[in-house]
């Protein structure tokens, strides 16, 4: 959760045209928030509400599009993406709840994210910030998200522009 908060803070600061955080470091979570968010003179109730709304959007995008460890059996876990969908049921009245469904069609995106996850420091995952920001803005289908992530990997992480891109988003 601290990483999710730090990625949310990066997105929020970017949207507000404020300076980015120096690095993603869970151990410096409180200091980072003090420096980049809580220490601002312009902080007010609306500002806080906007941050919470950004956090909600980031969390939804994270839950929907980003790999997690999934228990396959008692002694085996693997990376996977489970789609979220609303299901209703009538038992003496309507009940609505969210379910997660493991889809084979998401396997390619899960593999690509797994490569990105393991090829970078697992404490930073800088690819997540631009990916989450893009998902919030575009609200893509899974196919579009997969194509954009492939583009991110091929264009940014396979070239010299990675430092520039990560620095400014």
Indicate residue ranges for each PLM-predicted region.
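Flexible coil/loop and intrinsically disordered segments
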Residues: 1-169
């Amino acid at each position: 959760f601290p990483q999710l908060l730090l990625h949310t803070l990066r997105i929020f600061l970017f949207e507000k045209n404020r300076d980015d955080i120096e690095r993603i470091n869970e151990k410096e979570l409180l200091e980072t928030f003090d420096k980049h968010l809580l220490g601002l003179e312009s902080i007010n109730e609306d500002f806080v509400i906007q941050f919470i709304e950004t956090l909600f959007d980031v969390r939804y995008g994270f839950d929907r599009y980003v790999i997690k460890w999934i228990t396959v059996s008692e002694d085996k876990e693997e990376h996977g993406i489970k789609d979220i969908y609303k299901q209703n049921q009538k038992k003496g009245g309507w009940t609505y709840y969210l379910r997660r469904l493991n889809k084979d069609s998401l396997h390619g995106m899960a593999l690509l994210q797994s490569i990105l996850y393991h090829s970078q420091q697992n404490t930073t995952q800088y690819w997540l910030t631009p990916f989450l920001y893009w998902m919030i803005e575009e609200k893509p289908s899974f196919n579009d998200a997969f194509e954009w992530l492939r583009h991110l990997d091929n264009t940014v992480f396979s070239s010299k522009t990675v430092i520039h891109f990560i620095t400014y988003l």
